[in-house]
Amino acid sequence: VVVSDGFSLVKTDAEGVFSLETTDRSRFITLYTPTGYRHTTPFYVDIREGVPSSVSFGLVGADDYTGQFIQMSDIEERTYLDWMDDFKSYMEIKKVDFVAMTGDICYAPGLQLTGSEFNTDDVGVRMVYTLGNHDLIKGYKDSQGRDYGEKPYEDQFGPVWYSFNIKGVHYMVTPMLIGDATPSYTPDDVYNWMRKDLESIPEGTPVVIFNHGVLGNTEHLVLKTDTQTLDLSEYHIIGYIYGHNHVNYHYVNKNGVQMICTIAPNKGGNDHSPSSWRLFTADGEKLTNELHYYPIPKQMAATGRVVGG
């Protein structure tokens, strides 16, 4: 089982024991969910106030995973509204493995609302969040005096990058690199972790990446900085799922990666798409999806015109 502080990755021994050396930039120790298991404790430990001498995680075997998950994006919600109750009601009858909320939860009020009213316990299924550009908040510094725009997000949801595994598929959660405030991390930090994480899984493992936007470009997914190039085509990426653009969009790039953008479930899209979320099914190397539109009020309207006199 892989354990990480976001910078280094180590694997436990057969008994689940591990040793991890942290840095002054480490904020969380995270257990990357192995296939066939479910957490009985939080999947991360907050070490921002200090590193404990020992850390324990709980796992239990689980054979009821469906391979299905839901994505929504850009909810930008500050007030608890009816659509949230409607979605929770839907989740009572639709069994999925997790819900991915891909960014722009939106500013401190939105982060606080979602963290308190739209979390794993409230929705009844694991909630997976990614950090969007409007989730970086000004006015925060870390202990080293660096800009720390991701702090309010971390206070609610924990680490901004990590991975987990379900039914043989490897899911990577990654953050937006820029936004309304400056984060303490750099593109190199994110890309270094992505490289280590991808190299920690067996070759050929299908991978799905979540982000609020697109790292690199939709055609090639080649991630570059002044010091490195990370070509995601060298790995078995089957899906890249994001939001940010406020449109429903599904495109297969030249490397065969499905690029899938989804609008908000509470206000529709810039392309005039009605409010919706997306239901995915991951079956080995096959990733399919379908849109589910927000329930339309049961109202009828008619128009007509008078012909002749």
Put a short name on every predicted segment.
Residues 2-17, 21:
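Short, acidic Ser/Thr/Gly-rich low-complexity loop/linker segments typical of extracellular
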Residues 17-22, 54-58:
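Exposed aromatic-hydrophobic patches
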Residues 30-40, 44-113:
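N-terminal active-site segment of His-dependent metallophosphoesterases
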Residues 33-39, 43-46, 113-201, 226-239, ...:
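Extended active-site neighborhood of metal-dependent phosphoesterases/phosphodiesterases
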Residues 66-76, 168-178, 208-210, 258-264, ...:
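Active-site-proximal beta-strand elements of phosphoester/diester hydrolases
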Residues 281-309:
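A short C-terminal boundary segment appended to hydrolase-like catalytic domains
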